[in-house]
């Protein structure tokens, strides 16, 4: 617990600007502690007792301090809380701080109560190692079990680590290891607790209890380890609010705070907000919350408010305010990152001691596109459905505006709302949405691993936050963005820059999931490390897409036209990268056949303008209607050269269509040329191979049969479970907890997955071997 006497900066930034650690008056601390029912009171300022001396005349106050003490072998400093001292002892202790052994020996010799402060939290950017913790075990009988500015996770880890060293036998082993005598008086570590408050907001909200009728008895109980500890709710909001209060008071002392911001801070940091203050916050930020979350919610809304002002009036003042708002918005993330770093260090120590410190596995599946109509969105939707059906520890997290209606409560789906939304250059229909970074952090702090499916604004921000939180992150390459950029801009430099950026991005991940060998080779050629690459396949819904949906006169009854000749179908986005100019040119060579385009996009007007009359546009279709269009066509023609996988090719094959596909891109990997389809690479070859298909009905039937057999081997649930197994297995977690039952059916190889009882749980690969 700190007062204004802790007047030195605590970190590199506060040192840079000269901001002290606390501005709280000792008498205010005393008053609050009495109001909150504390029987005995002290203040533990850093390396000084000047603060507590201001209230030392009260009978329930005892003098204490938090000393920064050096550990020579570890070349690091630690903090030691010392209770019930006087000015002479303080002078002695200040002289002994350069050597922890001399410091603790003095305390033991004098019989002074003391406790090791925040054992698993590094001081001044140092590192807490296993050897340092083992020296703690040899030196200190009391540890600070709860530190009010740290999270609950660190409290749990500290208790587990301390328990691992219980007993004189363990202490003797460490004496032998470090060739030194322990200064311990008890075989078990006892606990103290403190708020570590620097702001005055949390005074008395974390405490140490003991059965005592005087402060002398209380100090004796601490010394002999007969204490209990307690706290109000912990959370990073405590430290965040402390930073806010200290920053605000520092600016006030420097007369550098605008009156509007001063009013805002007064409303936020008063413990009992007035009705006027509540109205002010609600009108300015739309806030109804109070307490610990208030400052966080203000920071959460700052970017959207300041950016809106900037859009309304682009002035230097508005720009400055927007930049300040964005910078302030990242304060909670910096604090959470620091706390997570301490947790990771503690977990490493626990692991080295054989302590299971892992949280229950939870994967956040991040995607910029979910409600849109594209392959990546459909894949994300299937991930959610499979995760729900098999109760996998996976949530799909998306960003969407309030205007999108979600049918019912979709399990395994979390939706963030954007603070900024804009159309993609060259593709106005596709929106890029940016949520607040705080909302991302609030979600990801509860997960143990992250998969970023898309490198859009949301995906990149989630990637950054996950890295700052020391979470394992995997990525995916679903879309050839550099090639798209080149097709639209003609800039080779932009294409090269984007490939370099993507290579850096993927190399920073644990693994990159690529849907085809073609693009795996491309990424490796562009600089992605080969050991990062994971190939994954996905099936499609063969109940929805199948040949049995062919109907007589379907196009006449549904769309009001009768195709002439045979139907050659394209399904997909109508955009430049899909190479639809080739589709149109081929159609011109077959005026007696009908060429249908299903889909929409930014290139539609251009394609329609250049199309002959035998090309028909049906727009966006989905579900049963799309499935019937597939089944009632005769040939599927897909000239796109930038497909990373080609879902629509699989849908066509499942619908019993022979397919003609570009040799370039990932979609070609589904085709064995001349067996279940044709591959082509230029206009002449497309025309020749399409002509062969149109003229030879038996060839079409053979291709269709072989296509269907191939697609049925890519069972939807089986392939997605295998994919999700890789995602989760990459994090060394418990993974699929259902069992597979395989059966052969006339239509091909089908997998069905059922829960099972009474058997050992297996991973997908183990289950597959077991079934074989």
Task: Identify the residue ranges that each predicted region occupies.
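Short alpha-helical donor nucleotide-sugar binding micro-motif in glycosyltransferases
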Residues: 444, 621, 628-633
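Carbohydrate-associated surface elements
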Residues: 518, 539
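Conserved acidic donor-binding segment of nucleotide-sugar-dependent glycosyltransferases
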Residues: 673-674, 678-684, 692-698
